[in-house]
Amino acid sequence: MALLGAQMVITLIMVSVFQKLGSFFSLARWLLCSTGLVRYLYPTDSELRQLAGIPKVTKEKSKGKKGSKLENGDVFRIPRSLDVPLESTKVSPLDVVHLRFYSEYQWVVDFALYAGFVFLMSEVYHGFYPIKDEVNLSTVWCMLVLGFATKVLVSLTVQYFKGEQSVGERSTVIVAAFAYLLIAMMVMVVDERNLESGLETAYQSFNTSAARFLGSQGLQSSGPASKLVLKFFLALWCGFIGGIFIFPGFRAARMHYDLLKYYEVNRIKRFLLNVSFASPFLLVLLWVKPVCRDYLTARIFSGMTAPLMTDGAFDSMRLVAVIVVALHRLFLMPIYLQAYLNMAYQRVQEQRKEAGRITNRELQEKIASVFFYLCVVTLQYVIPIFCCLFFAFLFKVLGGFTWSGVSVPFESPALLYSSPTATDDATTIMQSARQFTLALDSLKQVFTIEVSRGVLGFALWWSTFAWFSSSFLGILYQTYFQHS
């Protein structure tokens, strides 16, 4: 422990646990196979023939009809209005292992679990022994989770750009990306007295510290980049996030809409589901200064001598609220996934209202495709939650916040620069370590706590905003357009 440091020990332990325990226990597999999820089985050809009253074609008859579609004895047509009963069975590990994107789903969920444990253990340790002049390795784990989650969600979005039948989905992604880009540009011109973006303070701190660092290196510069350029690239990132969040939001909205129909009689559960669905909007309001911060930290109510909260307590409450909402939505995931699996039954019931005929293959594919894309739907559900959750973790650590709401003074390391003087092999390792430490100190001096609070705070707020707004658009679509 003394040689490697507590953070490295925690990381090595978690890597070892991840490697040894991964083959025996998987949270991703448990969520799909041990939470009571039920899938529907498609009817076999013999069952469909029996229901439709179609006699089985013998080989002799099929050979006598040259050019007939029944030569293989597989494809036949049945009435769409046919009452087809569906058998159900519980989802098992052997069923999900062959699903599309299952390996990506298992990796993202399990890695996020172990990264969460690393963050929790690091926070507990640093609560007793505060970190000094060290890199918090839990931030590396959080960044890896965000990177993996974004990569998988991008790969899912790219699927809409492949094939000629995805023109509508492709257009939706492009339009959503440009719409969110426009919204981000409008948000960035809002005064920080109304919206706590923190970008102005972050830019001023970054510009000043970067100019000071360049000056210490003998380079004369007033700043690395203009405010307009930095905000433009940040707006591009916002548009990118909005584009890849649009279909996860639509999918979550469809599952929520189906759940509301299922609990149509139980008003209490409908109310709780609606509160859970609207909870990201409440998180978005926590960054609107006149609505929340000024009301809770500045206003003194009658009969009181001080505001309800201090600024530090409000920041801690905001972080806790994001984490609670994210964990709550993860807790509800099996209910939403069951609502998705019930789509197979709903498709058959809706088909009974249609006229005409359908082939047995089309009916079987319509039912089987629901379960086939289960992991895709699960990824679309959990990745926006993981983005908000781990952005909150990074915001807490790099922003210098505390869980108790008590502000801790942050001391930036002084800018140091020294050139190596020794050249023998015995001091090479020490020189490399010293240069690495100086490089980290320089980065800390440039990317100050104000920069981290501004950038990560805005990233957290925008992820939450994109998460809710895409789901809200999905609810509008399901309510007024899909069933109009």
Where are each of the predicted segments found?
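Alpha-helical transmembrane segments of secretory-pathway, organelle, and plasma-membrane proteins
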Residues: 1-46, 79-484
